[in-house]
């Protein structure tokens, strides 16, 4: 039986981001369990030869990568040492996904350096970004060096798609 892919509107947003020349690292904010990780990983697997994935909530040790220098070559060396041979860094063909980035504020600060370096696409996801009182704030928010978008749970149209209602039927109902 063939698996059915969950269609989300954010896939179009991610494709537009990737196709934009000189795009900035992307931050996706949204509530827990709304599909950020699933959507980003699916997009990455379909559009990049190599996916480097760090989930700071699942493995707090990943934060050590960002404790020292935030120079991109140093970060690549640290990620390679931590992740082993599965972490392949090929300019233009590798995406770095920093999941639950709010757990590692310095990873967010590093986005500025990834932007100025330009060799790798970077997406960070977070569910508590900007929540006052959470207590984990970066030294420096990379203002102007990141693109921030919001993601929400399935809307009604996405729900219909997920339940096998054809796009054509949805369009007929809308009209």
Q: Where does each model-flagged region fall?
A:
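Phosphate-binding site recognition
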Residues: 1-175
């Amino acid at each position: 039986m063939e698996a059915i892919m969950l269609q989300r509107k954010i896939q179009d947003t991610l494709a537009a981001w990737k196709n934009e020349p000189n795009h900035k690292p992307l931050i996706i904010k949204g509530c827990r369990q709304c599909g950020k990780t699933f959507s980003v990983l699916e997009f990455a697997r379909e559009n990049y030869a190599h996916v480097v994935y760090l989930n700071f909530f699942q493995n707090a040790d990943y934060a050590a990568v960002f404790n020292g220098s935030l120079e991109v070559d140093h970060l690549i060396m640290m990620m390679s040492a931590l992740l082993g041979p599965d972490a392949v860094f090929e300019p233009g063909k590798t995406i770095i996904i920093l999941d639950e980035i709010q757990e590692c504020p310095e990873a967010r600060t590093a986005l500025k350096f990834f932007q100025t370096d330009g060799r790798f696409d970077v997406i960070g996801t977070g569910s508590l970004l900007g929540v006052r009182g959470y207590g984990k704030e970066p030294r420096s928010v990379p203002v102007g060096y990141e693109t921030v978008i919001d993601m929400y749970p399935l809307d009604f149209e996405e729900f219909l798609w997920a339940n096998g209602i054809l796009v054509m039927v949805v369009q007929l109902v809308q009209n």
